[in-house]
Amino acid sequence: PYTQNTFRENWIDDGNWACDNNSFTERSQRFFGNAFLKYSTKFGTDNHKLDVKYQIGDDAYTTNYSDIYGYGTTGYANGYASEYGFTVNEMNSLLTFTYNWNINEDFVFDALLGNELVDKRISNTQAVGYSFNFPGWNHLNNASVFNSSHEYKRKRTVGNFASLSLA
């Protein structure tokens, strides 16, 4: 079972053999959601109004991959396994203050003040193994040569904004 009859070029696995000995999987999990709070007041008058609004949202997901080339595959005669994945978490926060003042029939003052924060975190993990020790156990733990790596990145963006108008 660890040798194959191939009628194509020597770098292409036989289709039936590959189905029995090679595997490729992808698994993903995801969560996302948002919420907001809003407060409004007219200060007991008809010509002033203040709105304060806070919004927060999150998008978090993990995807893991596994690529297995079984013992006897044409590209890696003694087998090859790769498991890699990434996790991403992106949080967004927005706070705004909106003020409106009707000074008189001719003038209206509007003000907007805000702050936005976007925080993104990415984690990558990879493990690769070559040359399986035993045929029939196509798994990363069976590799005689093993390499792994991990990378973590974080990016934070902050923005402040304001607008004033008198019309």
Give short role names for the model-derived ranges.
Residues Y39-T41, D58, W101, L117:
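Short beta-strand segments enriched in hydrophobic/aromatic residues
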